[in-house]
């Protein structure tokens, strides 16, 4: 599926330049799990309106573990059905388009 919407306005970051836990999460997503949290893989509704406006169910969210702390923390990947990976480290307040290859 082709990516939905215009992503040209997003800051880009290479996967290798993110915390190592981001690579761990990316590899789990590419394998289809298993995921450490039941919320992983659920639909991300884009209520904040920051990501391109796509059909309901287009985006899914995944936890990027935070080394300290027992909760899920604030880091996530939001992945589009077209293969876009958006990284947030502030719980959806901002996103960077992640270059995964």
Curated annotation (Swiss-Prot):
Listed name of the protein: Guanyl-specific ribonuclease St
Source species of the chain: Saccharopolyspora erythraea
Keywords (A to Z) from UniProt: Disulfide bond, Endonuclease, Hydrolase, Lyase, Nuclease
Pfam family, one: Ribonuclease
Disulfide-bond pairs as recorded: 4-54
MF annotations from Gene Ontology: lyase activity; ribonuclease T1 activity; RNA binding; RNA endonuclease activity
Transmembrane domains' residue ranges: none
EC number per UniProt: 4.6.1.24
Catalytic reactions of this protein: [RNA] containing guanosine + H2O = an [RNA fragment]-3'-guanosine-3'-phosphate + a 5'-hydroxy-ribonucleotide-3'-[RNA fragment]
EC class name: lyase
UniProt record similarity statement: Belongs to the ribonuclease N1/T1 family.
InterPro entries given in the database record: N1-like, Ribonuclease/ribotoxin
Recorded superkingdom: Bacteria
Annotated active site: 61 (proton acceptor), 91 (proton donor)
């Amino acid at each position: 599926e082709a990516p939905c919407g215009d992503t040209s306005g997003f800051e880009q970051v290479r996967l290798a330049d993110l915390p190592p836990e981001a690579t761990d999460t990316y590899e789990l997503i590419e394998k289809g799990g298993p995921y450490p949290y039941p919320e992983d893989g659920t639909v991300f509704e884009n209520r904040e309106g920051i990501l391109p406006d796509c059909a309901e169910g287009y985006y899914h969210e995944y936890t990027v573990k935070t080394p300290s702390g027992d909760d899920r923390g604030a880091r996530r990947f939001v992945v589009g059905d077209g293969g876009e990976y958006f990284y947030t480290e502030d719980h959806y307040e901002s996103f960077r388009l992640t270059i995964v290859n």
